[in-house]
Structure formats: structure tokens, C-alpha cells
């Protein structure tokens, strides 16, 4: 049985350790100094790959390839629970991640970077909680509030990093996460726009939900790679265009993440870390009402 610590009377600043979850081109271990691989077992199975621990400018970081370093795990088959639990288990306090997205808005052009603030979950097959009633899991049922969906302070750090580096980035967006691996139909794409979606991808959910349930401060940098298929007169999204646009812009995301690591390390996050854990505890029912 896993126990979750809800109370902490320690008044000293809590140390930070930053998990970085990346897709193709953003799982390069060379961004870490003094790196070493660590295989972690979790109550929820194996993560997508071994964790790579190291430092970025003296700050402890952990790198995980969301789809495996061979990129052979499709979005539906990513073990999101094992990934998040493994990063939590090695002491991460923050998660900063990258994701490739289609744009549902004319003003978010292919190649643009976006720091999203909310999501719409259209997945159908993915486990969304650690509190599943099994013996090895935390006790109770967690009804986690998902507003705000992302850590606002972590989002602001990412935006500050982009500004300092003079890399344009849209400061908010709602991501629609679909099950995949197929792309949307045109009718679906139009529907998501009508719902208020700005971006569409296949990985934010349940990753962002599980990160919050694990008490981690989660922020994301999205690369808009295409216009999905809602624009009339356009052929729509295809894998080759996605990969090309992602590769052309991945260095900008790396620069933002590295800059953000330094910014996070300079600040005291004790209150945010404790509040994130307390949010989980306050919304977990462990007995009969």
C-alpha cells in the first residue's frame, strides 16, 4: 500500500528536482551533465524507457522519452501512470514537457510555440488515476479538481524563458487531446474549434492529470506543426509535415526548457509544492461518507 504524506511542518525551502518529458528530438541526453541511466520499477508497470538523471547548469534533472528512445510506443500505449510515478519516485517536484500539436487557429501558425493553459480530453482508453482501488495503489478515491489544469507559476516560468530568449510564444491555449493514432476527420476538427480548442494532440491527457494527482508542478511547451484539417483548400495533416516542422523548431524548445530549469532553481517553491500535495489530500475520499 502506498501512503501519501499530506502534512509537512518543515519551514526550510524545499529542494527542487525537474523532470523533463520529451518526444522526438527532445529526449537527447546530451542536454544533461553527469548523466546516468536509472531503471525504475513502479506499481503501475514499466515507464516508457530508463530515466536519465543528471544536471543542467548544476540543477538536478531527470529526462524521460515519452514514446521510448526508439519512438516505438504509440500515444495510446504510453504507460502514463508508470512514467509519472517513476519521476515522482525519484524526487521530481516539477515536470516541464514538450508536445507536438496541430493548430486549430489561424493565428497559431505551423512552427509557432505555445504554452497551453487548459485541455479538453477526448481520449477513450487511458487510465486517469493512481487511485484505482488496487492493493499497491494509494488508498481512497481522488476527485481531483482540474482548474487550473497546469501549474500557473510553472507556465509563467516557461513564458519568461521564451521572452528572455526572444523566442515568440503564445501565452495560452486549450489543447484537445484525441486518442489517436489516427488524425481527426474534418468534421471533428471543426467541432473542436467550435468547442474552444486551440491545439490538438495525442499526449497531454492523461499526463497532465496524473502529474497533478502526483503533486507535481506541470508545464508544457507545444510546437504547432500543422493546421490539422479544418482549413478549406488544404490537404490536411500528415506525418512527414509534422516531423519536418518539429525538427525545424525543436532547438527553440530546448533553449526554453534549459532556461526554465535555471529560473525554477532560483526560486523558493516550498509553498507551491506543499499546496500541490495538499490539493490531492483534500480531494481524496478514503472512507464511507
From Swiss-Prot:
Substrate binds at residues 202, 226-228. Its EC number is 2.4.2.28. The record marks 184, 239 as: Important for substrate specificity. In embryos, expressed in the fat body and visceral mesoderm. It catalyses: S-methyl-5'-thioadenosine + phosphate = 5-(methylsulfanyl)-alpha-D-ribose 1-phosphate + adenine. Disruption phenotype: No visible auditory phenotype. Catalyzes the reversible phosphorylation of S-methyl-5'-thioadenosine (MTA) to adenine and 5-methylthioribose-1-phosphate. Involved in the breakdown of MTA, a major by-product of polyamine biosynthesis. Responsible for the first step in the methionine salvage pathway after MTA has been generated from S-adenosylmethionine. Has broad substrate specificity with 6-aminopurine nucleosides as preferred substrates. This is S-methyl-5'-thioadenosine phosphorylase.
Amino acid at each position: 500500500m502506498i501512503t501519501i504524506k499530506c502534512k509537512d511542518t518543515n519551514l526550510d525551502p524545499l529542494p527542487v528536482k525537474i523532470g523533463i518529458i520529451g518526444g522526438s528530438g527532445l529526449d537527447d541526453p546530451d542536454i544533461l551533465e553527469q548523466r546516468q541511466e536509472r531503471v525504475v520499477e513502479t506499481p503501475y508497470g514499466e515507464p516508457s524507457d530508463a530515466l536519465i538523471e543528471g544536471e543542467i547548469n548544476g540543477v538536478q534533472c531527470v529526462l524521460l522519452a515519452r514514446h521510448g528512445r526508439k519512438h516505438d510506443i504509440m500515444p495510446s500505449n504510453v504507460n502514463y501512470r508508470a512514467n509519472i510515478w517513476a519521476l515522482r519516485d525519484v524526487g521530481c517536484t516539477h515536470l516541464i514537457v514538450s508536445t507536438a500539436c496541430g493548430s486549430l487557429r489561424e493565428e497559431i501558425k505551423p512552427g509557432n510555440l505555445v504554452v497551453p493553459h487548459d485541455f479538453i480530453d477526448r481520449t477513450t482508453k487511458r487510465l486517469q488515476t493512481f487511485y484505482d482501488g488496487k492493493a499497491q495503489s494509494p488508498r481512497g478515491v481522488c476527485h481531483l479538481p482540474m482548474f487550473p489544469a497546469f501549474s500557473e507559476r510553472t507556465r509563467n516560468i516557461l513564458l519568461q524563458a521564451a521572452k528572455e530568449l526572444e523566442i515568440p510564444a503564445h501565452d495560452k491555449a486549450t489543447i484537445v487531446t484525441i486518442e489517436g493514432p489516427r488524425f481527426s476527420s474534418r468534421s471533428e476538427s471543426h467541432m473542436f474549434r467550435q468547442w474552444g480548442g486551440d491545439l490538438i494532440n495525442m499526449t497531454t491527457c492523461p499526463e497532465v492529470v496524473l502529474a497533478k494527482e502526483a503533486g507535481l508542478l506541470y508545464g508544457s511547451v507545444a510546437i504547432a506543426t500543422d493546421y490539422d484539417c479544418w482549413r478549406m483548400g488544404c490537404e490536411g495533416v500528415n506525418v512527414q509535415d509534422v516531423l519536418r516542422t518539429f525538427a525545424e523548431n525543436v532547438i527553440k524548445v530546448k533553449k526554453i526548457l534549459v532556461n526554465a530549469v535555471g529560473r525554477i532553481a532560483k526560486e523558493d517553491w516550498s509553498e507551491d509544492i506543499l499546496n500541490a500535495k495538499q490539493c490531492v489530500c483534500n480531494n481524496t475520499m478514503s472512507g464511507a461518507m
